[in-house]
From Swiss-Prot:
Keywords: Ribonucleoprotein, Ribosomal protein. This is Large ribosomal subunit protein bL28. Signal peptide: none annotated. HAMAP family: Ribosomal_bL28. InterPro entries: Ribosomal_bL28, Ribosomal_bL28/bL31-like_sf, Ribosomal_bL28_bact-type, Ribosomal_bL28_sf. Belongs to the bacterial ribosomal protein bL28 family. GO terms for molecular function: structural constituent of ribosome. One of its GO terms (biological process) is translation. It comes from Methylobacterium sp. (strain 4-46).
Amino acid sequence: MSRRCELTGKAVLTGHLVSHSNRKTKRRFLPNLCNVTLLSDTLGRSVRLRISANALRSVEHRGGLDAFLVKAGEQDLSQNARLLKREIEKKLAAAA
């Protein structure tokens, strides 16, 4: 399982740990990933995703998983999230 957010694409970054004497050693900045179950109102079912804490805040800010995915660009989404987005868009188009 990769250390990448399924909704925002946040991944591991690398950099330096700098000591007081300015000595640099390599380190990794890991994203704050959480395994969450979100409810899709359109599909009427729950979905398990591995997303960052920042993405979880963004989902709640936008008004739910469906609203987030409809506005999200496809380049940042994982394959699982892209399929979910297409399902939601089809269901919304059929309802309209």
